[in-house]
A protein has these predicted regions:
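Bacterial Sec-dependent N-terminal signal peptides
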Residues: 13-32
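Loop/turn elements at helix/coil->beta-strand transitions in domains of secreted/extracellular proteins
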Residues: 59-63, 87-89, 146-152, 179-187, ...
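N-terminal carbohydrate-binding/catalytic regions of secreted carbohydrate-active enzymes
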Residues: 32-141, 278, 282-290
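Substrate-gating cap/lid alpha-helix
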Residues: 191-234
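Histidine-centered active-site loop/cap adjacent to the catalytic His
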Residues: 244-294
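Alpha-helical scaffolding within the catalytic cores
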Residues: 46-50, 129-142, 165-176, 205-210
Length: 294
């Protein structure tokens, strides 16, 4: 896996046609990896922009993905993209790593229980007999599945209530993992945009803190889930959904993806099928960049 510093600036505006079920595909400019970081946000969703050679390279990555129900937007979305085209073939194991040739293989550690949180990801057992244990912590997983080359932890609603000190601890812990496992690319992530009111305002602040950390460089990668799920293309421009609290615009899940507005909810993911697809497109884009696409 490439961990070198990609400094090439992309100035080409991509006008592409997508074959994954979207009726209106905008000209999209991929988010740029520069100054030692890359953020996969709402513009990093143009699947047709990924050269076939880098799509194939992305499939060679072995991905560890942990999270609760919101994280299934990635795996469910990936399955829908694969149904559209075998170019996007993927296989997800349940607490195991599949070994399918020519396919993106994902070690899925996902659950609707409260135990797949970041503390669980790090090392902590829930202490409850019969429930998941620290055998699924990132350390234990990497010992059991040393072929893994990428690890992603995705938030549920934790960031709606976390303090800035707790967010800082998350960032420091991931940086320590980066230093400990230099052959694994750890991906930072922002949280979802479901909450409104004071909780949503706090979540947005915490997400900004995560972005600011990633922008410090050191080859950091961010899956900007909040940015992806709050933006939608209206046929001529990107529209971000927000609400206002105390004079501040706060990002909020876009109506195009919100099952409460454009339902139904798709496979218990807290988004509709369109939202799952958009999240999965950005995930492919991110993996292609990790594989070396500039």
């Amino acid at each position: 896996m490439l961990r070198s510093l990609w400094m090439l600036m992309l100035s080409l505006t991509l006008a592409c046609s997508d074959t994954t079920g979207d009726s209106a595909v905008p000209p999209r400019v991929p988010d740029i990896f520069t100054d030692g970081y890359f953020i996969a946000g709402h513009q990093a969703t143009a699947l047709a922009a990924i050269p076939p050679v880098w799509l194939a390279a992305a499939k060679n990555l072995k991905v560890h993905l942990m999270g609760r129900s919101h994280s299934t937007q990635v795996t469910v979305g990936l399955s829908r993209l694969e149904a559209d085209s075998t170019n996007y073939s993927c296989a997800t194991g349940w607490f195991s790593l599949p070994e399918e040739a020519g396919t993106l293989n994902i070690y899925g550690a996902q659950s609707g229980t409260p135990y797949c949180d970041f503390a669980f990801y790090l090392n902590n057992s829930d202490g409850i007999p019969g429930n998941f244990t620290d055998a699924q912590s990132i350390h234990a997983v990497l010992m059991r599945a040393p072929a893994l080359s990428v690890s992603v932890f995705l938030w549920c609603r934790d960031l709606d209530s976390m303090t800035s000190n707790q967010v800082h601890d998350y960032l420091v812990q991931l940086a320590l993992l980066e230093a400990q496992y230099t052959n694994v690319q750890f991906v930072y992530a922002t949280g979802n945009a479901d909450a409104d009111g004071a909780a949503g305002h706090l979540r947005a602040r915490n997400n900004r803190q995560i972005r600011d950390w990633v922008k410090l460089g050191n080859n950091r990668l961010l899956f900007d889930y909040e940015d992806i799920i709050t933006h939608a293309w209206n046929g001529s421009s990107w529209i971000q959904s927000t609400y206002t609290l105390n004079g501040t615009n706060v990002p909020f899940i876009n109506p195009a993806y919100n099952p409460a507005v454009n339902g139904p909810e798709y496979e218990y993911t807290h988004a509709n099928e369109t939202g799952c697809r958009e999240v999965a497109k950005a995930f492919w884009f991110l993996l292609a960049r990790i594989a070396g696409w500039e």
